[in-house]
Design a protein with these regions (language model features):
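Metal-dependent de-N-acetylase/amidase catalytic core
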Residues: 1-9, 88-266
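Active-site rim/loop-helix segments in enzyme catalytic domains that contact anionic ligands
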Residues: 1-102
């Protein structure tokens, strides 16, 4: 499976979301020659107990840029504020305009079911944009140089934190990507977000920012190894959007080969 379009877009609600969700997979795709684009809808303006919204926004923007430089990715901020991401007309047109500008072949974003509404609304806006971007008569007000896309891209949802929805119900991924050889790069990229350690310790009771990510990716790898019989120390996990008009084949399996391990139910 090949395409002349080598662009991959990863969209998170806040700076550091993409790093946590899927940066190991992005490093793997970068090694294959893919062009990586990372979007944060907000600058994380509520993510501090020490700084004002303006101060923490500047800090987190710089942190996100440094992290993306390590990945060799282009970084964008979509102009939203924390806790103010909504599924409305203006927001849909804004994200659609950005998607048209980048014109990705593969898109990764949050799970539709997650622990906070910013993540869930981001997931919905990205899903909408993947579909809307290819409709010529759907007009956007900014980035007007970008025309409609020719195809609907592959769309993948990363696993929510702890693999659960808001009711604590387990969300089983469709497949896992072995990122064992890339975990150090992922750690270095996530470590760029220094401002978040104090915030997560105070608000979420999470003192071990990096170690929490390691444990989560290790638990995903344990399941991946169990179902596949392959060795994996760290893994990321995804579900593919398989609704009408979206691509149905798993392009990750084609690109990453033995590095992809699929749940038997799929």
């Amino acid at each position: 499976m090949t395409s002349e379009n080598k662009r991959v877009l990863a969209v998170g609600a806040h700076p550091d979301d993409v790093e946590i969700m899927c940066s190991g997979t992005l490093f793997a795709l970068r090694r294959l020659g893919y062009e990586i684009h990372v979007v944060s809808l907000t600058l994380g303006d509520c993510g501090s107990i020490e700084h004002s919204a303006e101060e923490i926004s500047k800090i987190r923007h710089c942190e996100a840029q440094r992290a993306c430089e390590m990945l060799g990715a282009s970084y964008y901020h979509a102009g939203f504020s924390d806790l103010c991401i909504f599924n409305d007309d203006e927001s849909n047109r804004r994200i659609t305009a950005l998607l048209r500008k980048i014109n990705p072949w593969i898109v990764i974003t949050h799970s539709p079911q997650d622990y906070m509404s910013d993540h869930e609304m981001t997931s919905l806006l990205v899903r909408n944009a993947c579909f809307y971007a290819s409709i010529p008569n759907y007009k956007t007000k900014d980035l007007t140089s970008a025309t409609h896309t020719s195809v609907i891209p592959y769309l993948y949802y990363a696993q929510p934190i702890e693999n659960i929805d808001i009711f604590g119900k387990q969300i089983t991924p469709q497949f896992y990507v072995n990122v064992s050889a890339l975990i150090e790069q992922k750690i270095k990229m996530l470590s760029c977000h220094e401002s978040q350690r104090n915030w997560l310790r105070a608000h979420n009771g999470m003192d071990e920012y990096i170690e929490s990510m390691r444990r989560w990716n290790a638990s995903l790898a344990e399941r991946a190894a169990q179902i596949s019989g392959k060795s994996a120390t760290f893994a990321e996990a995804f579900r593919q959007h398989l609704g009408h008009a979206y691509p149905k084949d798993n392009v990750f399996a084609a690109l990453l080969g033995d590095g992809v391990m699929t749940e038997p139910a799929y």
